[in-house]
Amino acid sequence: MNFLPFACGGRSQGAASSASEGSRVASRVGSRALGAAAASFAMVAASLGPIASGAQATDARYYDGSSSERAAASCWEVKQNNPQGKSGAYWLYTPQMSAPEQFYCDQETDGGGWVMIGRGRESWTENYNGRGDAKQIHQNPTGFDAVQLPGQTVNALLNGTHPQDLPDGVRFHRAMNVNGTAWQDFKATRAASTEWSWTLRSTMYWSNISITHPRQYRGYNYYSQEKTAGNIFRYGYSDDFRSLHFVEKPSQGYKLGFTYGSRAKITGWFQDYLLNRTSSYIYRPANDSTTPLVFTQMFLRPKVTQNDLAAKGLHAYSQQGAPASSRRALPNSYSEKWKWRTSTDTGTGKKGEMNTQVEAITEVGGAVFTGGDFAYVESASGEKVEQAFLAGYEVGTGELRRSFRPKINGQVKSVEALPNGLLAVGGSFDRVNGEYYNGFVLLDPKTGQVAKDWDIRVVSRISSVPVQIKTLHVRDGYLYIGGSFTHLKGQTSPTYAYSRNLARIKLSNGEVDWNWRPVFNGTVNGVNASEGNSHVYVAGYFTQLNGGEAFRIANITNPRQSGGDWTHEPSYVPSSAQTWDLKNERKMWGFQFDVQDAGSSVWLGGTEHMISRYEKSSMRRTYSAITREGGDFQDLHLNGNTIYGACHCGDFIYQGATKVDSEWVNATDAQTIRLVAAFDKDTGQVLPEWAPIMNGAYGYGVWESFVDSTGTLWVGGDIRKSLGANGVQPTIGFARYAPRDVAPPATPSNLKVTKNGSKDQLTWSGISERNVKYQILRDDRPIATVTGTSYSV
């Protein structure tokens, strides 16, 4: 019997100091627990030799789910090994799980082998991380307060199978009366679901619908293989017991839950009062005439066996164990406790999506600076500081940098840290500390005083087009300045250079790059350069570059190039669009807000709800996603291998979608999005385990995201509330998300093994880190998780 840790990576490892006679013992670090609760795991490893007859290695029936050591691959395998077994709690394990866990298995319905993934009457969630204490599913399978497994756990139970490929689909077990004595089974396949998602309100394709009832309701039985798009299923005009809807109930505090159709007659005449009892399986409050919520259990039936686990590969541990493993670096889903916030009113007095409280964030000189349209900042203790449009906060503490007090008379739209330690500021202003600076200024990040090392000036010589600097970007020796303007001058010459809406300054001496002066016929919203500045990617409202067609985007390899070969297929084209002559298009559609170089790819975010990824080698689109109900993507930010995409969107993001208003047609799945989401920069896929919840006052969304030097993600825009670890917070203007713990714990040591009759007794020296759990691994899998420093097997 081999006790070994599963494969991880991270810190260096050391061997255990002792072992029983004839045994080789090693100790290795394990990994942090996956999921919302960041529990730690340290792995204990030992090679002890075989016990008994080694039945577990040769007889699949050994894995019957009766204990963590005998965890089965699925409820289906439990049923095959014990056909007479009853429904209840069983231990299951697949290699995608960190350790065996208990789940509720329905072994009596339709052949058995069903694992329950959620249950409840109200308060369901669409959050990928599920809801509540997962143990409550197998401990209290009929509880009314919804509990749902994390999406990561559901995917692990499937052992690599896509939900859309499950032969038996998803099973909804629903009460048919208020007493819970009659039940319906509704089975259906969600066609586009490459991974599990709780976004059941989203319009998606469902097929292979099978509805069965007890004898007295058998007239409602139904079966169809047809594919239908909707909020699960509506049974035509009848909309009765055969309909299955997942809805948000304003009459019940916007709680989510399942309902039948509006025409389902649940109680007899004059008995609707039965629905008002809190003990009813089908419930609505008194004085509520809407369709009631129905207690529902959800099941899947992955038919995974030990042979399937072996075929896909279990953990190949060496005699010395395995290296440590760390999770992907992402923020926590809960916002940090707020210390400062902006005013709810704008500093300019204007209202609109172009005048949100925070639109620009960067770090320089030990502080994070937030710029936008706000009148003052306010602390959690109630202190009000009259500082408009731009403020700084100490990186380590989040406290206001009180020495930084610039006086700016207009909205800040962009900020950028310069290598020389100065803060570049752009926007719609013309006075800074009483002096004339039109849309651009350099500040000392300690004091807020104008830094006069370089005298860089931006002007517009078109009277109807005021200066507005919307984007600043530093890359390999240059500062790129984009927005609305016609000319600018640098430090080395009083002469103004014509470089319309985009220019760059040499960071070596503050000089305008006279050899790089593109001309765009519309505002530049975003700019991002590749390494070495060989490619400069641009997004905005323009249709021309140097007189050639460049519809809303450009890939500049030569500043004198006319137009370009990078084209974008919009998610929506209005019927009145001048598609045959985009170069001279006057209607405003298809515009883009931001662009981000990401190594081998370029990301684009803009109008009509789309975010997309392009492969640099071909400039071909390889990924796209569309939000609904939602809005434009307004900001992109790269940190490591993760892209943060921000938008004015608040429900679903359809991955693979290409057209707005029919997102589900080409979608591979749908996940939730609440104003900002994380994406893998190389695959394009949403990283759904980061699932923040925030909202704003007007629906203008998030306009800036930035990861500081501590790994904390800052997001700014029209934000009024965010969900923190202790509840909803009034995070006005911006919110912060600290990095989740990804470092493996230290190595346990001094592992000893002694014989205690027919059992082996393992003991070891623990580590000092708090809340650590230890996993015991045998041969190719973990068999137990303990909080102490001993285990008997």
For every predicted segment, state its role.
Residues 2-57:
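Secretory targeting and sorting signals
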Residues 6-9, 73, 103, 647-648:
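Secreted/extracellular small peptides and ectodomain modules produced from precursors
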Residues 56-322:
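Mature extracellular or lumenal effector domains of secreted proteins
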Residues 43, 292, 727-730:
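Short glycine/proline-enriched turn or capping motifs at secondary-structure junctions
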Residues 304-792:
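Extracytoplasmic surface signature
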Residues 31, 72-77, 99-103, 746-752, ...:
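Short small/polar-residue motifs
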